[in-house]
Amino acid sequence: MKKLLIHTICLLSALTTSTAVAAPFTAGITALNRQHDATAFRAWKRIADLGDAEGQNNIAYLYERGMGVKQSYQNAKIWYELAAAQGLPEAKHNLAMLTYQGHINGRDTRKSVEWFREAADAGLIQSVYMLGVLYMEGEGVFKNYDKAFEQFIHAAKRGDARAQYMVGAIYAEGFIDPADEPDYAKAFLWSGLAVLGGGEQAQSLKIAASVYLEKDQEKQIVEQAAQCLKTNFEICE
């Protein structure tokens, strides 16, 4: 199986709640873009202390990375938990990543599954993808390739390039059912969509799949990919 790509932590760059904290939130984004990490931390700490979930998530991100403040997974956990308690999906995803990567009292994949599932249920595609990874690997859940594919295809149809790559890889290897033959046409389609979405790692898979296709098949699939994008993936399987 192709190497699984892992989604990293989520930093919020757009405010979704009260405009009362918009100025310091935006100031933090501007500072971070200019690599003024300590200034970003101070700006977000102000609104985090006022209970703003986005600010809490973002200073947790800085603690986790050691950007503008001394690196501390424990402090990152505290602030992520405060934001997650307010229902912020990104904070739940980030807590899941901390536990998945073993940064909080050892690796706890079952707890990761809980956080990823909550964030995925709230619509966070990064978490949908990560549930696919966990089902594929059998981490925190029983290994189940069908469920892994369900998560990957769902995220792929929402435009996630990593998920599109994984869908292509699964089709290329006939991974769902050992009795199935590889479907190189679908592998070419989804890896091509991943490349269009910025997933450079999918280029090698696209090339490998193309070896098994005729030129007229490739042309038809390229046209199908265009229709997939035009219809927001409604016609893609």
Protein language model regions, located:
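Positively charged n-region of N-terminal signal peptides that target proteins for export
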Residues: 1-4
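Terminal, low-structured helical/coil segments at or just beyond the last alpha-helical repeat
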Residues: 196-237
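Hydrophobic face of amphipathic alpha-helices that form TPR/SEL1-like repeat modules
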Residues: 24-31, 58-65, 94-101, 105, ...
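Canonical positions in the second alpha-helix
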Residues: 44-47, 82-83, 118-119, 154-155, ...
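Bacterial N-terminal signal peptides
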Residues: 7-16
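N-terminal leader/linker segments that initiate helical-solenoid repeat arrays
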Residues: 17-58, 234-237
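Structural signature of tandem alpha-helical TPR/SEL1-like repeats
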Residues: 35-42, 70-79, 105-115, 142-151, ...
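Short helix-capping/linker turns of helical repeat alpha-solenoids
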Residues: 36, 49-53, 65-67, 72, ...
